A protein has these predicted regions:
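Short, acidic, small-residue-rich periplasmic hinge/interaction motif at the N-terminus
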Residues: 30-36, 43-48, 75-81, 91-135, ...
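Short acidic/polar hinge/loop motifs at secondary-structure boundaries
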Residues: 65, 189-219
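A beta-strand signature from Gram-negative outer-membrane beta-barrel systems
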Residues: 97-99, 205-247
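Extracytoplasmic beta-strand/coil segments of soluble accessory domains associated
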Residues: 145-190
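Face-selective signature of the C-terminal outer-membrane beta-barrel domain
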Residues: 309-328, 344-528
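Gram-negative outer-membrane beta-barrel transporters
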Residues: 506-508, 662-827
Length: 955
């Protein structure tokens, strides 16, 4: 921690030295509509080299100071308009610039409908604008993953599919929690999932209204140190801002319907009182169109107020207040195919608010300072109403105390008979809040431009839900105990970061950009076993523009490199495993002389196992890349390696316990019974002679009970090669060809020793099974690897004169090889399957003593010398589900084709149509593991044939 602070101070002092030697220049002007000349207030002007920017005031004026001399690139953006870049050669202050933005339209010469590599960024960064989203009819933010290099389309683009974003990962089933480590933020506010008790997964994006999105930025490479609590990159969503026309969207797909309406209101003359953006979106998806009753609904409302203050003083203050909400969820109450009055309701309510103040004093020692506060509250209550029946009354054990208990209507109650409905409610209310302060310095030195930002973040995560409970506690099912989420401590985190972006120009038109940053996170969990933990995250990137000239074959050549460490905080599921209870019946009398039955149970609670040695999961990321522009053809190639260390993994812990079991008497109706709560001994009292009492004989039963403990697993490695080739436009055909793809390799092999046993079998001596095996990993396969080669070829024809754009995309998988692994497997077990023997085992009597498990030959010999021990130990052998479980599987190449069409009709109407797998490819693919040919139809390899149409109105 001390070294980190010293490094931060050193970087800051170096930045101050640079600032004192600065010779800055000023650029000012106006941003107006190209057709009407009206000012475009709240447009943004961004200096691309430093990522410093400003917001246009109500008169359309902007001023950006402290810019370096020489060539600088400015990007001007405004929602609904095509962005524009200005390249200026600054030798003195430049004023009076008039930037004329044209409305985004297919009549423009340049239109993008795919993910574009961000310019002037050393790390891999892709940008997807509104035109691309409309052309591809995005209804869920996670759908944009298909637009990345090598990305694959999904057939059913509906809200029923709660797919989580997992950057640079083939699937969310891989080890290392790839989706949990992929961060999502909307207008700078993190959409977190740390407060969930039921999963350790990425945040769901179904509550985010897509019709209100202006653009999406996807950082798959090294993220800025400004962003913490991640390990696999970040997705940044930017929503609409500024004065906009009334827009109405309607989308129709087989499983999904969507309608939205939005507008940016000018409050007062020339927006002197600010601008209010409002958007409402209704969307509904059905699970099955032949029985459209199980559905997911999204009712999203967005209100956003923006205002420029203190414009006259030359140091504008931008005030933004955002409020986003969603009322929706999944519902199956109306399904006539289900049992009468049975249903499942899952709320997906969200309320997110944010206040941001951005002040730009443009001083020598301070360029910009931003203060932001945000809060996110969710309601994920789930109700499940089930139909139950029982011919006899069953005991429900609800005690939380260890020992023997009698069904007396308190700790153990007797359930009803006949038919009834039972309503179970799982109440989860995650809360995330944060306070953020960020400052920026921007200056120019004699031979180098320098941009420094530093900040502090405070975030907290918790859950105010009640957990699982029942509407009628007398009907609470067996083994239910109350476990409230709102009693668990909140997780608090303070992040400190500093980042220095240095840029050195060369005489040949090239330049070198180096970004170095350091982040320190301090995590505190009060009243828990974890206390306070700290983590240090250094990150750095380099971008070398070797030369820049349009007079040679190589118009530009850019080399990039990067490294970084990113730390992912744990979820509440990881931090707070629940207490488990083992309930075993120790006595059942049958009906006694009074017509009653006596039931006794022994309860053994296994307290929540907190791992005080738990380490925070982190990733080490490395990147190398090259970009080139050769005669109008733009080429980008990136090589990456991501290693996830200390991933969060759940493991089973087995604890021995014992109790006294008493068999019932044959003539039960002649006695009454009492049970000792401490010893479990049963006393029978004769009805004919109450003085005759006898303690019934009992036997001691030895059992194991299990509980979950979260630990750190083995390192997971992902590496690959990504490429994008945008060929020069074929002017005669108005067509551009794009080839993108990725060569991806994943390897995860769990080497951590984990326990496993069966709790349902018995030993040779008749006792419940008491042996525990210790294996590498918690499955039959300790790990797996997978290599894929995906390539997409997209032909985009854009005819501006008729406002038409057509894209045809071929998605091809040329290579798919995967294999499960386990170094200790024995093939040919029982002639067909594979068997895995544990490395060690323990017994009920000595749970802490690990005994080496016999080898296959020793186990065979044991069968002759001690058949009982052999039979007991053989139960620990884990067997594969198929004979080809560990066989390398090579899939033959396969492909699908998508068609997208967008047509503008006049100035106010546009229509988009798309069809995935429109050829409905049903060819066969070959699997080497099974040596079989299987149809691609509904195989999951390619999307099913699917289509949709969207109508947009701008008034």
């Amino acid at each position: 921690m001390k070294r980190a602070l010293l490094l931060c101070i050193s970087i800051w002092m170096a930045a101050q030295a640079i600032i004192l030697s600065a010779q800055p220049y000023l650029v000012s002007g106006r941003v107006v509509d190209a057709d009407t000349g009206e000012p475009l207030d709240f447009a943004t002007v961004l200096h691309l080299e430093s990522r410093q920017g400003t917001t246009v005031d109500t008169d359309g004026a902007f001023s950006l100071g402290r810019l370096p001399g020489g060539k600088v690139s400015l990007e001007i953006r405004y929602f609904g308009y095509a962005s524009q870049q200005l390249v200026l050669d600054l030798r003195k202050d430049t004023t009076g610039i008039v930037v004329q933005l044209k409305k985004a339209s297919l009549k423009l010469e340049e239109v993008t409908v795919s993910a574009e590599r961000a310019e002037l960024e050393a790390s891999t960064d892709y940008h997807i604008d509104r035109t691309a989203m409309d052309h591809n009819q995005i209804v869920n933010v996670s759908d944009v993953m298909a637009l990345l290099p090598g990305g694959k389309s999904q057939g059913d683009l509906s809200l029923m599919n709660d797919e989580r974003l997992a950057l640079r990962s083939e699937s969310n089933t891989e080890k290392g929690n790839p989706a949990f480590g992929s961060a999502i933020e909307v207008d700078g506010m993190r959409i977190g999932n740390n407060a969930e008790m039921s999963e350790t997964n990425g945040a769901s994006t179904r509550t985010l209204s897509t019709s209100d999105i202006e653009s999406i930025e996807i950082v798959t490479g090294i993220a800025s140190v400004e962003h913490g609590d991640l390990s696999n990159g970040i997705v940044k969503v930017r929503t609409r801002r500024g004065k906009t026309p009334l827009s109405v969207d309607a989308t129709v797909k087989p499983h999904t319907k969507l309608v939205s309406i939005g507008k940016g209101f000018d409050l007062g003359r020339n927006s002197e009182n600010g601008i209010l953006n409002a958007n409402f979106e209704w969307a509904r998806s059905y699970k099955d169109i032949s029985s459209p009753y199980t559905s997911y609904t999204r009712n999203g409302l967005t209100l956003r107020y923006s205002r420029q203050l203190a414009q006259e003083q030359g140091s504008p203050l931008l005030l933004c207040v955002d409020l986003k909400g969603n009322v929706g969820g999944q519902n199956s109450t109306a399904d006539p195919d289900a049992f009468s009055d049975t249903y499942t309701k899952k709320r997906d309510y969200a309320l997110r608010g944010q206040i941001r103040m951005d002040w730009q004093p443009d001083r020598a020692w301070l360029s910009e300072i931003e203060l932001r506060a945000d809060v996110s509250m969710q309601d994920k209550r789930q109700k499940v109403n089930t139909n139950c029946n029982s011919a006899s009354s069953q005991p429900y054990v609800h005690t939380t105390e260890q020992g023997y208990h009698i069904a007396d209507g308190n700790t153990i109650i007797m359930g009803p008979t006949g038919y009834w409905y039972n309503l179970a409610i799982t109440d989860s209310k995650p809360i995330d809040a944060g306070l953020h302060l960020k400052a920026k310095w921007s200056q120019d030195w004699t031979f180098m431009s320098n941009y420094v930002k530093a900040g502090v973040d405070y975030t907290l995560s918790g859950n105010n839900g009640k957990g699982l409970h029942y509407e009628d506690l007398t009907l609470a099912t067996e083994n239910w105990r109350e476990a409230r989420y709102d009693t668990l401590p909140f997780m608090h985190n303070i992040g400190l970061y500093v980042e220095d972006r240095m840029r050195m120009p060369f005489r040949n038109g090239g330049n070198l950009q180096v970004v170095l940053g350091l982040r320190e996170d301090l995590t505190h969990i009060a009243k828990s076993e974890y206390g306070t933990a700290s983590s240090l995250s250094p990150r750095g990137t380099m971008r070398w523009n070797v030369f820049g000239s349009k007079k040679r074959t190589f118009e530009s050549l850019i080399l990039t490199a990067g490294f970084g460490k990113a730390v992912k905080l744990p979820s509440m599921q990881v931090l707070y495993p629940t207490t488990t209870y083992a309930d075993w019946q120790t006595f059942a009398s049958g009906t006694d002389a009074l017509g009653q039955a006596v039931y006794a149970y022994y309860t053994n609670p296994t307290r929540a196992l907190y791992n005080r040695d738990l380490k925070w999961q982190y990733s080490l990321q490395h990147e190398l890349g090259v970009e080139a522009l050769i005669k109008g053809t733009r080429i980008s190639v990136t090589c990456f390696r991501n290693a996830t260390h200390n991933p969060y993994v759940s493991s089973n812990i087995y604890t021995p316990f014992s109790y006294e079991y008493t068999a019932p008497l044959a003539n039960a109706d002649q006695y009454t019974y009492t049970v000792d709560g401490q010893t479990g001994k049963v006393t029978a009292t004769s009805l004919s002679d109450p003085t005759q009492q006898s303690v019934l004989p009992s036997e001691t039963v030895h059992r194991l009970t299990s509980n979950t403990k979260w630990i750190n697993g083995s390192t997971v490695v992902r590496k690959g090669l990504e490429w994008v080739i945008d060929f020069a436009k074929i002017r005669a055909l108005n067509t551009q060809i794009r080839v993108d793809g990725d060569l991806y390799h994943y390897r995860g092999n769990e080497r951590t020793l984990m326990a496993y046993t069966t709790l349902t079998q018995k030993q040779s001596d008749g006792q419940p099974y008491g042996y525990v095996g210790y294996y590498r990993g918690n499955n039959v396969a300790t790990g797996s690897y997978k290599t894929t080669l995906n390539t997409n070829v997209t032909a985009t024809t854009h005819i501006p004169v008729i406002s038409l754009i057509v894209s045809l995309r071929f998605e091809c998988t040329f290579l798919e090889v995967s294999q499960r692994t386990n170094d200790r497997r024995i093939d040919g077990y029982m002639g067909y399957y594979s068997a895995v023997l544990p490395e060690y085992y323990s017994t009920w009597a000595n749970p802490d003593e690990l005994v080496r498990y016999p080898s296959a030959d020793e186990l065979t010999a044991l069968k002759e010398t001690d058949v009982n021990l052999y039979n007991d130990l053989a139960k620990l052998i884990r067997i594969s589900s198929t004979g080809y479980f560990f066989t390398k599987d090579r899939i033959s190449p396969y492909f699908s084709t998508n068609l997208n069409v967008t047509k503008e009709i006049g100035k106010h109407v546009s229509v988009s149509f798309y069809a995935t797998n429109f050829w409905n490819n049903t060819s066969l693919y070959h699997s080497s593991a099974t040596d079989r040919n299987t149809s691609l139809y509904e195989s999951g390899k390619i999307p099913s044939f699917y289509y949709g149409i969207t109508l947009k109105l701008k008034l």
